[in-house]
């Protein structure tokens, strides 16, 4: 286990919950948060607004393993959700998920599309249709990618890019419902979508945390 590769965050157990208690914490510069997970009771905690916001700006907060120091106890978690105030942008609440460091976990990772304007098909008047903007993967908590790159440069009109065409890290496995789904296709302008794309109309691939 490489502790140097983790984000370390100090936290405190909060005894009281509810809107009033959360408002009081925020007034003191603290963020109300919760840790939850399979076969574990949730733990309500608070953490420093300034410290956690700095971590969010410094690290890929949704793809880095976090060591939460709660008094003398340590919990290993990943960030599942961050709620922000709609006006001030201050962090209003954070959801963390317990992590078993020795077990693989299932999660959704965004796709980053490269060379859209340089794409062969686009240069010849085609239009890119993106079928999936994220993938469901299974991997160790120590190898969660921030994102996965999809290079569109060589996709011609009438051609599609499948998951099997991507250069993916050896540390992850894609676990989508479809077998080798189409990620993107290039069609002639005004020419509809390809047969591959029709078959690959994205289903609801919502991951079950930790499965």
Curated annotation (Swiss-Prot):
Keywords: Ribonucleoprotein, Ribosomal protein, RNA-binding, rRNA-binding. GO terms for molecular function: 5S rRNA binding; structural constituent of ribosome. Gene3D superfamilies: Ribosomal protein L25, beta domain, Ribosomal Protein L25, Chain P. InterPro entries: Rbsml_bL25/Gln-tRNA_synth_N, Ribosomal_bL25/Gln-tRNA_synth, Ribosomal_bL25_b-dom, Ribosomal_bL25_C, Ribosomal_bL25_long, Ribosomal_L25_dom, Ribosomal_uL5_bac-type. GO terms for biological process: translation. The keyword Lipoprotein does not apply. The keyword RNA-binding applies. GO terms for cellular component: cytosolic large ribosomal subunit. Belongs to the bacterial ribosomal protein bL25 family. CTC subfamily. This is one of the proteins that binds to the 5S RNA in the ribosome where it forms part of the central protuberance. Part of the 50S ribosomal subunit; part of the 5S rRNA/L5/L18/L25 subcomplex. Contacts the 5S rRNA. Binds to the 5S rRNA independently of L5 and L18. This is Large ribosomal subunit protein bL25. It comes from Anaplasma phagocytophilum (strain HZ). The gene is rplY.
